[in-house]
Amino acid sequence: MGVIKKPDLTDPVLRAKLAKGMGHHYYGEPAWPNDLLYMFPVCILGTIACNVGLAVLEPSLIGEPANPFATPLEILPEWYFFPVFQILRVVPNKLLGVLLMASVPVGLITVPFIENVNKFQNPFRRPVATTIFLIGTVVAVWLGIGATLPIDTSLTLGLF
């Protein structure tokens, strides 16, 4: 562990270096344009080159071709649509299911207005937003797991 000395701003040599811009970045090389115009494109193009190289040299196999004449008994959407699929599958009225799905973003938009008196960044000092987030996460995971099960055990997840 090293000892860190607080800089003495009354030192005339240090003040002269700071006036020349030789403080934190001692070599005097500015971030603009060197880093932003030269280093970032190199990193971005290098990342793209690595991705293209992996895609060309090691392509992922798609699997067997689909048979249009043989469909599965139950077609499941992608995993990120499981909670929405479960809402539409469980609610008997489709209009009510669509309204339930539309109420989620509307409810999330109203959270800052409910808690506008609280200006803290710490989530433990914003109990309404934290509670809504935790309950929403649990409900979304519950619905997502239930969407993969048969309809008769989907709401209870086979636990009850």
From Swiss-Prot:
GO cellular component terms listed in the entry, alphabetical order: chloroplast thylakoid membrane
GO terms for biological process, alphabetical: photosynthetic electron transport chain
Family matches, as CDD domains: cytochrome_b_C
PROSITE patterns according to UniProt: CYTB_CTER (PS51003)
Transmembrane segments: 36-56, 95-115, 131-151
One Pfam family named in its UniProt record: Cytochrom_B_C
Gene3D superfamilies: plastocyanin oxidoreductase, Single helix bin
Location of the protein in the cell: Plastid, Chloroplast thylakoid membrane
Annotated membrane topology: Multi-pass membrane protein
Residues of the signal peptide: none
Single GO MF descriptor: oxidoreductase activity
UniProt keyword list: Chloroplast, Electron transport, Membrane, Photosynthesis, Plastid, Thylakoid, Transmembrane, Transmembrane helix, Transport
NCBIfam families tied to this protein: cytb6_f_IV
Self-association state and partner proteins as the record states: The 4 large subunits of the cytochrome b6-f complex are cytochrome b6, subunit IV (17 kDa polypeptide, petD), cytochrome f and the Rieske protein, while the 4 small subunits are petG, petL, petM and petN. The complex functions as a dimer.
Family according to the record: Belongs to the cytochrome b family. PetD subfamily.
Function recorded in the entry: Component of the cytochrome b6-f complex, which mediates electron transfer between photosystem II (PSII) and photosystem I (PSI), cyclic electron flow around PSI, and state transitions.
Name under which the protein is recorded: Cytochrome b6-f complex subunit 4
Gene field: petD
